[in-house]
Amino acid sequence: MFQRSGAAHHIKLISSRRCRFKSSFAVALNAASKLVTPKILWNNPISLVSKEMNTLAKNIVALIGSGHPVLNKVTSYYFETEGKKVRPLLVLLLSRALSEIPMTERNHLKIDKSDVPEDPIYSKPSQNQLFQRPASSISPLHILHGIKPLNPLTKGPEPLPEETFDKQRGILPKQRRLAEIVEMIHTASLLHDDVIDHSDTRRGRPSGNAAFTNKMAVLAGDFLLGRATVSISRLHNPEVVELMSNSIANLVEGEFMQLKNTSIDADIDTIENGHKLLPVPSKKLEVKEHDFRVPSRQQGLQLSHDQIIETAFEYYIHKTYLKTAALISKSCRCAAILSGASPAVIDECYDFGRNLGICFQLVDDMLDFTVSGKDLGKPSGADLKLGIATAPVLFAWKEDPSLGPLISRNFSERGDVEKTIDSVRLHNGIAKTKILAEEYRDKALQNLRDSLPESDARSALEFLTNSILTRRK
């Protein structure tokens, strides 16, 4: 009994000492944290680029300004609410991370010494374009905008405030403009998508088409793309112009791929026009199709169930790249190009954006099954109702061949949507999609570590990459 009491007293004494030590250590940490201010709030990557993000919407509205008040209202509609703004955030954080690469390794683009502070490191004659600001215009303004003294409604966008390069922040003027361009292109795609998908809500309020009619939403999206391409051209970099212009084409290609769920489904041979289904006009020119296409059943192709699933996933991933990952990956590549980085770093930045973009869409497809429309900011379960088979459905189809006919007819018959949802839950389609998303997340993290030196900006990118898997909207 005495020994037990002694042991208990000994344990209590050790525990007391440990508590005092723990308490002392906590006090020391708290005191140290007051002396050393952390450079980044790890749970808030926006803090590193808050200056640029805070003026993003304002600068975009200035870039897209029109002399027509209704056009201004519609094009600026989606910029009035707080969206995720993931794409410009990625470009800005990546630009800061790239600035940590020594200048001696960023010698693949010339720098304009007249645009930077007096500093020997920026005054090399062989580097005279890197810090150059985007041009305000290339062609004469009266040609670009048709300005006439007697017609004050025809005018170009408002001039942007002059931004001087901040060596401590490391984001170049052209990279900042790139972030704004990316958000313009993405927002244009949202305007068009909401028309195509007959959406009623976006970001918790009426969608552009619901608020202004389909016609206004389409025209506003077109206008945004036009303004974006003008801004792209003013970056004066042929590869950047090519990449960003191509990303716009990719968005459209992805939307057309979404008309079918697999590459072996029958081609769409009608066009919906209101309540009529019109035949597609006969082809006058033969256009070469992409390599991802495979012969259809109508051409006598015989595939096993596993082969059908494999081709369906290949089709889905390629469609996902075009619709979501192309804009992200190509903007990341452009940020690296504008930084003067080496070809190896540029390639890694592109792969980072591609893997992150596919991960982002996989999570989006999961949320369509798991999150309410109110939390998501757009209608939940929309994909199935639109006849679209996403990754959770494809995983369920692998285990449940009876889903094949439902997918082929785009879930158009009574009970198809409900049966598919039940099958997804029964066969763990959501959990399997999460595992696939984690694989792409891990690849994206590796791309960052292989291409960028350790820095607060890289840590913020890693945090952002990990947070994609836990987002709820």
Curated annotation (Swiss-Prot):
It is an enzyme of class 2 (transferase). It is found in: Mitochondrion inner membrane. Its cofactor is Mg(2+). Pathway: Cofactor biosynthesis; ubiquinone biosynthesis. GO terms for cellular component: extrinsic component of mitochondrial inner membrane; mitochondrion; polyprenyl diphosphate synthase complex. Isopentenyl diphosphate binds at K84, R87, H186, R203. An all-trans-polyprenyl diphosphate binds at R202, K323, T324, Q361, K378. It comes from the Eukaryota. Keywords: Isoprene biosynthesis, Magnesium, Membrane, Metal-binding, Mitochondrion, Mitochondrion inner membrane, Transferase, Transit peptide. Mg(2+) 2 binds at D193, D197. The keyword Nucleotidyltransferase does not apply. Mg(2+) 1 binds at D193, D197. The keyword Membrane applies. One of its GO terms (biological process) is isoprenoid biosynthetic process. It is a peripheral membrane protein. PANTHER family: ALL TRANS-POLYPRENYL-DIPHOSPHATE SYNTHASE PDSS1, GERANYLGERANYL PYROPHOSPHATE SYNTHASE. Belongs to the FPP/GGPP synthase family. This is Hexaprenyl pyrophosphate synthase, mitochondrial. It comes from Saccharomyces cerevisiae (strain ATCC 204508 / S288c).
